[in-house]
Regions:
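C-terminal or mid-to-C-terminal helical accessory/interaction module adjacent to the motor/catalytic core
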Residues: 94, 137-221, 256-257
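Amphipathic alpha-helical transducer elements in NTP-driven molecular machines
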Residues: 11-18, 35-38, 42, 78-89, ...
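Short, polar/flexible loop-turn hinges at active-site or ligand-entry regions and domain interfaces
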Residues: 73-76, 104, 124-128, 149-156, ...
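Intrinsically disordered, low-complexity regulatory segments
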Residues: 1-164, 470-471
Length: 698
């Protein structure tokens, strides 16, 4: 009997698939049933080979060996995952397996994970695609009933492959180029570099910020306070205050308007990561990791989404969810539920996956017993669903203008008429008292009653107040995610899809890479560029730092998913960029190339090429990158006599090829002795010899 093989991304997901496919027989690395087999990857089972695996000459980083442009891309099994790969490869080639099912995450990265394993295993069997947005049993069962051919996802797969190859080409070539030209490891990344540039640019603005004073004049009659526009000159402000103090002012205009604020949208991944950081201080990575676990536990829908809407066919199920939210949220009662379901429905703005929602299973199981951090996330998602479908916030805005000494002074008041969705927002904020408060854009204030147009205000008091411009704030996880999401948007026309730096699924890992590489650092909730990060940005050309160019690449990948451009077009541009990087690096002046090298003590001249020899942690090495000469501090020759090479010895060896060494130890005679250490060269390699100086005759 023929079977089909399902490949999941993780073991926990595979178990959910197996349960719904009645594949209960547990084997080493897979589960099997009568009609199917379910196995799993462990994230990326396969990856692109390193340059030295294409050609051994790339083991040594040489600028003249660049560019590295593979004609045929080589794949290899990821470290420590060979056993599981062999399991999948064997299953793929089993004679009773008729076709495969790609059950990896329904998105670009899931396509890449499956495609690499499929190619590396040399499989040619037909593939179907499982595409689901929830791990609930009903969603899984429906997904298997409505599978499409993998051929229908070929453009998505192509975009995934091109993204990975572009990152490899720019990373490998850019990093090797700048490292060899500056004699210091400098890591270049397609998305990482412009993100670091944003951090460095913001920090530079902060460090060079000079505050400037500006002034206002406030008038009051004891009840109402009105304020002038900003005044740049202090003397002018003082003069206006003096003129108005004790004068009679006139109310020239009172304008009342009924206004409304609309509820927020549902969460996509980035907006959820931002709010989780604001409310709870969670990093983007921590939020994504917990969301993935909640997804696999069947409590939330697919997390790596870029949509904040749901589709028309979900209307009834979403309404049912909203009605059940008071069961999960103690601070929400049924009277606060609105009827704004239409606002969250937009078929045109849902591509692969809809907005993040709690599942029916979450309602049935409850969230009370979850760990605190996961419970926080679940509450955040649930209350957002209530807010997004809630009633509008209505308020009355009053603007009053008072004229005094021919100058206008103004005040604004806001009085709530209907709290609507803000009632839930306020209750949730009170629940999260330990979290960093979310800044209110406008505070609720009221204009005192009893004022009418034409009314005179006698003997008003006038006072000059001093204010200062504020420096830009350092990025935190919330604001950096926002900047990445909108990077380059102003440069695109209205018809262009705006994708920013990275994707919702990759932004967290980009931030983590910057921190782990030492180019950025966390200071409390702030994310700051390190000294090394700022130095790296200084040597990078504008086109590598450009958020606009990188955002345009993301847009092109999206167009590729839609079949509007080809992989050849995209990769042609990436290859051209690689060549441009090398052209620029080749022209870096010699003096500029030494910018990272500190003034170092010259130990001597290299006996092979004549260049300076410097001291390293483990050796004394030639400064010429093309020369391999080095004297090792711990070497076998001296080590056998319990001695290491020190700076004085190295200096004398380089100067006159001889140094006198005291305290050498002979194991054979179990005694210490003194001798001359001689340096010679054999095929350019250092060789040591001992010579015992003749004792002088008395």
């Amino acid at each position: 009997m023929s079977k089909f093989l399902v490949i999941a991304e993780k073991p926990s997901v595979a178990q959910s698939y197996a349960k719904n496919l009645s594949a209960y027989k547990r084997e080493d690395g897979y589960l099997e049933g009568e009609s199917c087999i379910v196995s799993w990857c462990l994230g990326h089972l396969a990856e692109y080979a390193q340059p030295e695996e294409y050609d051994p000459k790339y083991e040594k980083w040489q600028f003249d060996d660049l560019p590295i442009l593979p004609e045929v891309w080589k794949l290899k099994v990821s470290k420590d995952k060979k056993k599981q790969f062999e399991v999948i490869k064997t299953l793929m080639n089993r004679s009773d397996v008729e076709y495969l099912v790609n059950g990896c995450d329904a998105g670009r990265e899931g396509e890449l994970i499956f495609q690499r394993v499929y190619v590396l295993a040399g499989c040619r069997k037909p593939v179907k695609r499982l595409w689901i947005s929830s791990m609930e049993d009903a969603a899984i069962q429906k997904g298997f009933q409505t599978m499409k051919s993998e051929e229908e996802y070929k453009n998505l797969c192509m975009a995934a492959v091109c993204r990975a190859q572009a990152d490899w080409l720019i990373g490998m070539n850019g990093t090797r180029a700048y490292t060899t030209r500056y004699f210091k490891r400098l890591v270049v990344g397609r998305v990482q570099t412009p993100t670091l540039a944003m951090l460095a640019e913001r920090q530079e603005r902060i460090e060079h910020f000079q505050k400037e004073a500006f002034y206002k004049v406030a008038l009051t009659d004891g009840k109402l306070t009105v304020v002038s526009e900003n005044i740049a000159n202090e003397e002018a402000a003082e003069l206006l205050a003096a003129l108005c103090n004790g004068s009679t002012a006139v109310v020239t205009q009172i304008k009342k308007e009924r206004k409304k604020s609309f509820p927020p949208k549902l969460y996509d991944l980035t907006s959820l990561q931002r709010e989780a950081n604001r409310y709870f201080g969670y990093t983007a990575k921590r939020t994504l990791d917990m969301l993935q676990e909640l997804y696999e536990e069947k409590l939330v829908t697919y997390p790596r989404t870029d949509s904040q809407f749901v589709t028309e066919d979900m209307k009834d199920s979403v309404e049912e969810l909203v009605e059940k939210m008071p069961v999960l949220l103690s601070f929400v009662d049924y009277g606060q539920l609105g009827h704004g379901i239409k606002r969250v429905i937009n078929n045109a703005k849902v591509s692969d996956h809809h907005a993040i929602l709690p599942t029916k299973e979450a309602v049935e199981k409850g969230i009370a017993d979850l760990p605190a951090d996961k419970k926080n996330l679940m509450m955040l998602i649930c209350q957002q669903l209530v807010q997004a479908t809630g009633e509008e916030y209505l308020y009355e805005q009053t603007d009053i203008t008072v004229k005094c000494q021919e100058h206008d002074f103004k005040a604004r008041g806001k009085i709530p008429v209907q709290m609507g969705f803000k009632e839930v927002e306020k209750a949730f904020k009170q629940l999260c008292v330990k979290a960093e408060p979310v800044e209110e854009k406008e505070k609720e204030t009221s204009i005192p009653a009893g004022y009418e147009e034409g009314m005179r205000l006698f003997s008003v008091k006038a006072e000059k107040t001093t204010h200062y411009t504020s420096p830009p704030k350092p990025f935190n996880e919330d604001t950096l995610l926002a900047a990445m999401e909108t990077a380059g948007n102003k440069e695109f026309d209205s018809e262009t899809e705006k994708k920013g730096l990275g994707t919702p699924a990759t932004r967290a890992s980009i931030i983590e890479k910057l921190v782990s590489s030492g180019y950025a650092q966390r200071k409390g909730k702030q994310i700051l560029p390190s000294t090394e990060g700022k130095e790296l940005v200084k040597v990078m050309p504008e086109y590598l730092k450009s958020a606009v160019m990188t955002a345009e690449w993301e847009n092109q990948l999206l167009l590729m998913e839609k079949g509007e451009i080809t992989d050849t077009q995209f990769m042609g541009e990436i290859t051209s960029l690689v060549r441009k990087i090398l052209e620029v690096c080749r022209e870096i002046p010699e003096e500029e190339r030494r910018r990272f090298q500190m003034e170092r003590e010259v130990i001597g001249k290299c006996p092979v090429c004549g260049c300076d020899v410097f001291e390293g942690k483990q050796n004394f090495y030639c400064s010429n990158r093309q020369c391999d000469f080095a004297l090792w501090k711990e070497n076998r020759f001296l080590g056998s006599m319990e001695k290491n090479l020190d700076k004085k010895m190295a200096r004398e060896l380089l100067d006159k090829a001889c140094t006198h060494v005291k305290g050498l130890y002979s194991k054979k005679k179990d005694m210490k002795f003194d001798a001359d250490l001689l340096l010679t060269l054999e095929d350019g390699k250092p060789r040591f010899h001992l010579e015992f100086p003749k004792k002088k005759k008395k």
